Amino acid sequence: MTKDETLLVFTLVVSSVSIFLFGILLFMVLISATRDFRERTKSKLVKIMIWAGIVVITFAIAVRIYPIFIFLLKERIKPLVEALYDKLPWIWEVSLSRYWDRLIDFLDRYLWACAQRIQTGIRKQKGEFVVTFSCRVKKRLYARAIEVGIHLSLLSNLFWILKTTLAVGYRLL
């Protein structure tokens, strides 16, 4: 298989999985729409639906971003890097790919650590929230902190997707 065929097969597989997961998500939304709101918030179906939505969004982002990165790597970035290497030969010793790998790993670990700290802080401060705030305020604080933790976890996953996409794209070049 050539590089273009490999890219086409990868894009088709990821697109078909994304469409399949979107269909499952739509089916779950239609099922849960018939229930009472309180039942929906308590059921496991909503949790499954949320995770399916996260997976669908992740696959959709990967499908949309992957060809853009391949295009940028082939058409824009690779000639610039080659010209830079021609002008500054000492950069070969620095190894830019290793630098970018380390930078992305650092950002990935940092965001994951932030999410873990927020979740740990929620558990540690549980008693303090109970004493200090009313029940309604406490629930809002928990919900906001958990939401921030989820966003940080999603950003961490996006950095992992970016790192993996760049690694695969670089190998295809």
From Swiss-Prot:
Q: What is its main location?
A: plastid
* Keyword vocabulary terms for this entry: Chloroplast, Plastid
Highest taxon of the lineage: Eukaryota
Q: Could you confirm whether the keyword Chloroplast appears in this record?
A: yes
Tell me where in or outside the cell this protein is found: Plastid, Chloroplast
GO cellular component labels: chloroplast
User: What family is this protein classified in?
Assistant: Belongs to the ycf73 family.
List the protein's name: Uncharacterized protein ycf73
* Species whose genome carries this gene: Zea mays
